[in-house]
C-alpha cells in the first residue's frame, strides 16, 4: 500500500505526489490517513504527481497530508443487504440503521456488456398514465427520459411512475438521487416506507449540497447495484428485471462540468466539458438488458432554459428508447401531467409492437392535435366562426382529447385532494378511440378534465349538467 503527500488543493481537485515506482492507476481510490476522505485518481501528471477528485468536502485539507493508495477503484456493497437502505456515493449507509448486511462488493467502474451479451425486447411496460401508455409507450428493459425545464413536473411524474410500476412490479428497484433536493429524497424514502415496498428498493443519494465529486459518481454507484441484481443468477440461471431511476441526469453532467476546468480541460460548447459525450456514453451504455436480466431505466433530464438543443439534453436524447417531453405551455393550461403529445416519442410506436388498433388510435390523436395546433393562429385572429364545419369538429375533439390526456396522480393527492387514478392500457385505447369516433361529441369538454377512464368523464358530465 503506497503512500503519497498532498501537494496542491484547488476546490474539489487535489494533487498528490507518490514515489515514482508506486504511482496509482487512473480511477484508483486514495484515502486520507487523517480524516478518511476518499480521493479518486483522474490524471497522471508526470513526476509522480496524480490529479484526483475529492469524494467529499476538501475543507481543512492542507499540503503535506499523508494519503494511502487502496490499490482498487471505489467499491460499494451490492446484493440483498442494500435493499431498504440509503447509501452515499461510497456505499456508506446514511440512514442510521447500522452497517449494511452483505459480504459482496463491486467496483463502480465496470465495462459495458459486450454486443453479443445484449438482448432486445419488445415487451411493453404498462405505466397506468394515459398519455404515456398511448403516445410514448415504454419497453421493458428500455431507457426512458423525462425532459422538462424547471417546475413542470419531472420529479412528480417520476414519483408517479415509481408508484405505479415499482409497486405493481414484483422485481427490485434502485433509485439514484443525483444532485437533487434533499427534501425530495426524504419524501421518496417515506413514500416507499408507507407503501410497504421499501424492502424492494435500494437508494443512493448524492444531493445538491454534496461536492461535485460525489454528484459525478453517485449515478455509477446506483448503477453498479442495479447491474449486480441484473447479473446475479438464480438456480435457473436467470438474473432479475431491475428498475433503475435516476433523478437527475443533467446534474451528473453539471458535476462533470464543475470539475472539468479544474482538471485543466478546455471547455467546449456552452461551457460544458469536452468529454461530455464520452461521460454520458460511459454511463448510458452500462444501463442495458442482457440475456441474463434486464434494467429498465427512467431518467429525469433537466432542460436548461427550456432549450432542448442545449448540449446536455441533446447528448442524452441519442441514448433513449422513449422520450417524454414536459411542456411549460401545457402546464400553463393546467393540464397535468404536462406531457407534450406531439414532441414525445417512442421507438415502440409501431403497429408490429403495439398492434394495429393502439397504433391507429395514437396516430389519430396526434393528427387531431396537430390540426388543432395549425388552426390555433386562425382562431386567435378570426375566431371559431370562420372555420369550416369539419375544422370546428376537429378543434372540438382536439380540446376534449387535450383535457382527457390529463390525469390525477396518486403522489399529488395530498396537494390536489382528488384521488389518483391508474388507467389500464385497454381502457385508455377505448376512451380515445371513442372520442375520435365522435361518440362523446355531446359531452362538454370540462367533463374530460382530470378524470381516469372515459366512464368517469360520462359520470362527471352528469354532475356538470
Swiss-Prot record:
First-tier enzyme category under EC: translocase
Keyword line: ATP synthesis, ATP-binding, Cell inner membrane, Cell membrane, CF(1), Hydrogen ion transport, Ion transport, Membrane, Nucleotide-binding, Translocase, Transport
Pfam families, per database record: ATP-synt_ab, ATP-synt_ab_N, ATP-synt_VA_C
Enzyme Commission code(s) on record: 7.1.2.2
UniProt keyword Membrane, yes or no: yes
Catalytic function, reaction form: ATP + H2O + 4 H(+)(in) = ADP + phosphate + 5 H(+)(out)
Subcellular localization(s) per the UniProt record: Cell inner membrane
Membrane-topology annotation of the record: Peripheral membrane protein
PROSITE patterns: ATPASE_ALPHA_BETA
Superkingdom classification of source: Bacteria
Any single GO CC term annotated in Swiss-Prot or TrEMBL for this entry: proton-transporting ATP synthase complex
PANTHER family the record matches: ATP SYNTHASE, ATP SYNTHASE SUBUNIT BETA, MITOCHONDRIAL
Entry similarity comment: Belongs to the ATPase alpha/beta chains family.
Quaternary structure (record): F-type ATPases have 2 components, CF(1) - the catalytic core - and CF(0) - the membrane proton channel. CF(1) has five subunits: alpha(3), beta(3), gamma(1), delta(1), epsilon(1). CF(0) has three main subunits: a(1), b(2) and c(9-12). The alpha and beta chains form an alternating ring which encloses part of the gamma chain. CF(1) is attached to CF(0) by a central stalk formed by the gamma and epsilon chains, while a peripheral stalk is formed by the delta and b chains.
The protein's name: ATP synthase subunit beta
Species in which this protein is naturally found: Neisseria gonorrhoeae (strain ATCC 700825 / FA 1090)
Gene name for this UniProt entry: atpD
Amino acid at each position: 500500500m503506497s503512500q503519497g503527500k498532498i501537494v496542491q488543493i484547488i476546490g474539489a481537485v487535489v494533487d498528490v505526489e507518490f514515489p515514482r515506482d508506486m504511482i496509482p492507476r487512473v480511477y484508483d481510490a486514495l484515502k486520507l490517513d487523517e480524516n478518511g476522505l476518499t480521493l479518486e485518481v483522474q490524471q497522471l501528471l508526470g513526476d509522480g504527481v496524480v490529479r484526483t477528485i475529492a469524494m467529499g468536502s476538501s475543507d481543512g485539507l492542507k499540503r503535506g497530508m499523508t494519503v494511502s493508495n487502496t490499490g482498487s477503484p471505489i467499491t460499494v456493497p451490492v446484493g440483498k443487504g442494500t435493499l431498504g437502505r440509503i447509501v452515499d456515493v461510497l456505499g456508506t449507509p446514511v440512514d442510521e440503521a447500522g452497517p449494511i448486511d452483505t459480504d459482496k462488493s463491486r467496483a463502480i467502474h465496470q465495462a459495458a456488456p459486450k454486443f453479443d451479451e445484449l438482448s432486445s425486447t419488445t415487451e411493453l411496460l404498462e405505466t397506468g398514465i394515459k398519455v404515456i401508455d398511448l403516445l410514448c409507450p415504454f419497453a421493458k428493459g428500455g431507457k426512458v427520459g423525462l425532459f422538462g425545464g424547471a417546475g413542470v413536473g419531472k420529479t412528480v411524474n417520476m414519483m408517479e411512475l415509481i408508484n405505479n410500476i415499482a409497486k405493481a412490479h414484483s422485481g427490485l428497484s434502485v433509485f439514484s438521487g443525483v444532485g437533487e433536493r434533499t427534501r425530495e429524497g426524504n419524501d421518496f424514502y417515506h413514500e416507499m416506507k408507507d407503501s410497504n415496498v421499501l424492502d424492494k428498493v435500494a437508494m443512493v443519494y448524492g444531493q445538491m449540497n454534496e461536492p461535485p465529486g460525489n454528484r459525478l459518481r453517485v449515478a455509477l454507484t446506483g448503477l453498479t447495484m442495479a447491474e449486480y441484481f441484473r447479473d446475479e443468477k438464480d438456480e435457473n440461471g436467470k438474473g432479475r428485471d431491475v428498475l433503475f431511476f435516476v433523478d437527475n441526469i443533467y446534474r451528473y453532467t453539471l458535476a462533470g462540468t464543475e470539475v472539468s476546468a479544474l482538471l485543466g480541460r478546455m471547455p467546449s460548447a456552452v461551457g460544458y466539458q469536452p468529454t461530455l459525450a464520452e461521460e454520458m456514453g460511459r454511463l448510458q451504455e452500462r444501463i442495458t438488458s442482457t440475456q441474463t436480466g434486464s434494467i429498465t431505466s427512467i431518467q429525469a433530464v433537466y432542460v436548461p432554459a427550456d432549450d432542448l438543443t442545449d448540449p446536455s439534453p441533446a447528448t442524452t436524447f441519442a441514448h433513449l428508447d422513449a422520450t417524454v417531453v414536459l411542456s411549460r405551455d401545457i402546464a400553463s393550461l393546467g393540464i397535468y401531467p404536462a406531457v407534450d403529445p406531439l414532441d414525445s416519442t417512442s421507438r415502440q410506436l409501431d403497429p408490429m409492437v403495439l398492434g394495429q388498433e393502439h397504433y391507429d388510435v395514437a396516430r389519430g390523436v396526434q393528427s387531431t392535435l396537430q390540426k388543432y395546433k395549425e388552426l390555433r393562429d386562425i382562431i386567435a385572429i378570426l375566431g371559431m366562426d370562420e372555420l369550416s364545419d369539419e375544422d370546428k369538429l376537429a378543434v372540438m375533439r382536439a380540446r376534449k382529447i387535450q383535457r382527457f390526456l390529463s390525469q390525477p396522480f396518486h403522489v399529488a393527492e395530498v396537494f390536489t385532494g382528488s384521488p389518483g387514478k391508474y388507467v389500464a392500457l385497454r381502457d385508455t385505447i377505448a376512451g380515445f378511440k371513442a372520442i375520435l369516433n365522435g361518440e362523446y361529441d355531446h359531452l362538454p369538454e370540462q367533463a374530460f378534465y382530470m378524470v381516469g377512464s372515459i366512464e368517469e368523464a360520462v359520470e362527471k358530465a352528469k354532475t356538470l349538467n
